[in-house]
């Protein structure tokens, strides 16, 4: 399953896994892993979509993970009942290509976010994800202005309820033609919106592909960053020696900036034991 498929199926029913339950793989009496506490660990549910959410939440809790993210409203209570947060929720059933960079999209997007912001606040969901949308021939300055026009209309409600709208930085090779594909562009948009309730979702995997210089850019733009995603490059798999980024150094740099938000694991496990891979990558990032 991909992010595109997950967003596109937001209105669908919960996945039911046939065969042997994952609970047998998780165990019933594992003590919770003690982590250092410098990083608030989260994980994207779509990467583990074949594991029933309740069982996945139990496994995450035992690993010391604090949040399962990129969930629809119907799933927020499930993770809350497991003692976890949902660090990032969805507000609209529109996917990545249709975003705030086109004025004709604003009516639906604003209505969807205005309706979801109070619900997110009530459920303790601190962030709602949004996207710029694809260029489709639009220049970057026009796209930025259009995004700012739409996002500014949401800021009074976001500020009232204490919910942050985060726009994800994506590479425009895998997500062909996506407009918010550079940190500098996203930061300039942040200045234009002018509210602490608009921030960027800095995806390390995507920005390594687009511009590299990950640590320096995190330091430079940290005031605009409200959430962080991981992923091995190339391939978006585990954060280990099979890929080019040295995640302990990146996490150390993030901690030194004073960043207090979540770091969400968004790699797609290549190993058969997905939960073991997740636990290993959490430990790699726990500096």
Please tell me what each predicted stretch does.
Residues 4-61, 125-126, 180-202, 206-287:
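Histidine-acidic metal/acid-base catalytic patches
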Residues 10-22, 35, 99-199, 209:
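Active-site acidic/histidine proton-transfer and metal-coordination neighborhood
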Residues 47-49, 72-74, 92-94, 134-136, ...:
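Active-site-proximal loop/turn and secondary-structure-junction residues that shape catalytic pockets
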Residues 56-75:
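Catalytic domains of carbohydrate-active enzymes, especially glycoside hydrolases
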Residues 76-80:
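Active-site-adjacent beta->alpha loops and helix N-cap segments on the catalytic face
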């Amino acid at each position: 399953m991909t992010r595109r498929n997950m967003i596109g199926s937001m209105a669908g029913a919960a996945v039911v896994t046939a065969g042997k339950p994952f609970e047998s793989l998780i165990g019933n009496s594992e003590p919770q892993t003690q982590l250092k506490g410098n990083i608030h660990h989260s994980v994207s549910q779509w990467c583990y979509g074949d594991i029933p959410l309740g069982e996945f939440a139990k496994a995450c809790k035992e690993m010391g993970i604090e949040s399962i993210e990129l969930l629809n409203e119907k799933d927020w209570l499930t993770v809350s009942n497991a003692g976890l947060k949902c660090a990032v929720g969805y507000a609209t059933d529109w996917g990545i290509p249709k975003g705030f960079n086109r004025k004709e999209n604003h009516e639906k997007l604003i209505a969807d976010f205005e309706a979801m912001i109070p619900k997110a606040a009530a459920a303790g969901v601190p962030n709602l994800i949004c996207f710029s949308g694809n260029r489709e021939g639009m220049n970057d300055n026009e796209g930025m202005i259009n995004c700012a026009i739409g996002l500014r209309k949401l800021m009074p409600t976001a500020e009232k309820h204490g919910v942050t709208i985060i726009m994800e930085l994506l590479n425009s090779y895998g997500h062909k033609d996506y407009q918010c594909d550079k940190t500098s562009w996203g930061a300039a948009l942040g200045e234009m919106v002018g509210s602490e309730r608009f921030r960027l979702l800095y995806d390390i995997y995507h920005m390594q592909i687009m511009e590299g210089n990950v640590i320096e850019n995190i330091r430079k733009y940290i005031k605009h960053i409200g959430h962080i995603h991981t992923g091995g490059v190339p391939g978006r798999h585990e954060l280990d020696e099979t890929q080019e980024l040295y995640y302990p150094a990146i996490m150390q740099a993030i901690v030194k900036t004073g960043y207090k938000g979540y770091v969400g694991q968004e790699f797609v496990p290549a190993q058969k034991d997905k939960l073991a891979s997740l636990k290993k990558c959490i430990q790699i990032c726990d500096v």
